[in-house]
A protein has these predicted regions:
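Glycine/Thr-rich phosphate-binding loops that ligate phosphate moieties of nucleotide
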Residues: 1-139
């Protein structure tokens, strides 16, 4: 199920698409924080690839919510290149996993304050909690 809060008769397709992108970015932020908790360290930069990286709105929102830079991989072959890099490193033919990989392409820096990012994520988490509560109540 999905919900959209704050819809009115003036809400158009652009606002709905933006809401979906913001929801994706917020969920990724939750996952990154969970990974940081499991790793016991802070992620300093998020490197991304794939079709959704074509959305500058999503990438900027991601940087804003995480409060870290988001770097786009410059090749559409990121997965294959990553596998090759791991194989080279595993065969001791490279000194690091990243050796020989292209430098990141575009970089998005956070453009909102940490306090604003926290408020947006808290609003997202409250909305998710309301949806989860309504689902647990049954039909």
């Amino acid at each position: 199920k999905a919900t959209f809060e704050g819809l009115s008769l003036d809400t158009g397709a652009a606002e709905i698409v933006r809401a979906v992108l913001e929801g994706i970015a917020a969920q990724v932020a939750v996952l990154v924080r969970a990974a940081e908790s499991d790793l016991g360290e802070t992620i300093q930069v998020l490197r991304v690839d794939g079709g959704l990286t074509r959305s500058s709105v999503l990438m900027q929102t991601q940087a804003d919510l995480l409060q870290i830079p988001v770097e786009l991989f410059p090749s559409p072959h990121a997965t294959a290149l990553g596998v090759a890099a791991l194989a080279r490193y595993g065969a001791r033919a490279a000194k690091s996993i990243g050796e020989g990989l292209p430098a990141p392409g575009r970089r998005y820096e956070p453009s909102i304050s940490a306090a604003a990012a926290t408020r947006r994520l808290e609003r997202f988490e409250r909305a998710v909690a309301r949806v989860m509560e309504s689902l647990s109540e049954g039909p």
